[in-house]
């Protein structure tokens, strides 16, 4: 069972450094890390880091241009992947050690096309005004919209594709399930309020 960890990145240097190092340390030997870079937005420091990893065979790197269509972008990432299953992770997310070390076993024991992954969203600097403005739910731990399950694990087959320009979703799978709704299986997704506001404003332009 080979897993392809598929990552899209544009300018998240510090975040992707944590992510790639973590995946490299904990993944199976046969697994691969595929990185699709939005080249026009990349800093020289990010380019240099990605090229070092590519030269060391830590990652498979493709440089391209994001044209405002998220499904097309993720489908381009899918084409890079040669694993039996693809785990799609944003550059500013981080899976747990339990997830990376056990997901292949989970997939081997379950003939499933797509699996939803819970996500722990936190925003540093979040105020009550922001929560009301965006209609978010925040629990006692400061997690936003928990469990915020995401379509992030899918069989690598031509029939399963991403659709929609914004708020992209997977289409073409026949069977689906959820990982346990627990922190140990969830992707961590920390942001600052400045980054959140910038991202929300960007989505409004698409």
Give the label of every model feature segment.
Residues 10, 38, 119:
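Histidine-centered beta-alpha loop that forms part of the nucleotide-sugar donor binding/catalytic region
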Residues 70-78, 85, 94-206:
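Catalytic-site signature of metal-activated, phosphate-bearing donor transferases
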Residues 18-22, 49, 76, 101-103:
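A short acidic, amphipathic alpha-helical/loop segment
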Residues 62-70:
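Short, acidic/glycine-rich phosphate-metal binding loop used to engage nucleotide
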Residues 25, 79-80:
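Solvent-exposed polar/charged
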Residues 20-63:
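Acidic donor-binding segment of Leloir-type glycosyltransferases
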Residues 1-25:
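N-proximal low-complexity "stem/linker" segments adjacent to membrane-targeting elements
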């Amino acid at each position: 069972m080979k897993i392809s960890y598929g990552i899209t990145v544009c300018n998240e240097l510090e975040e992707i450094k944590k992510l790639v190092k973590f995946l490299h340390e904990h993944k199976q030997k046969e697994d691969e890390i595929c990185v699709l870079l939005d080249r026009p937005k990349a800093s020289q420091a990010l380019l240099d880091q990605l090229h070092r990893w590519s030269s060391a065979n830590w990652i498979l790197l493709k440089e391209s241009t994001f044209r405002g269509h998220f499904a097309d972008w993720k489908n381009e990432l899918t084409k890079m992947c040669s694993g039996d299953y693809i785990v799609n992770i944003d550059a500013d997310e981080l899976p747990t050690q339990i997830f990376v070390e056990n997901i292949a076993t989970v997939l081997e024991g379950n003939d499933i096309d797509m699996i939803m992954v819970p996500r722990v969203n936190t925003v540093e600097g979040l105020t009550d005004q922001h929560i009301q403005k965006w209609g978010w739910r925040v629990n006692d731990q400061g997690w936003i919209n928990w469990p915020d399950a995401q379509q992030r694990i899918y069989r690598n087959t031509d029939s399963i594709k991403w659709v929609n320009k914004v708020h992209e979703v997977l289409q073409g799978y026949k069977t689906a399930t959820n990982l346990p709704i627990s922190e140990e299986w969830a992707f961590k997704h920390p942001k600052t309020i400045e980054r959140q506001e910038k991202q929300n404003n960007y989505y409004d332009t698409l």
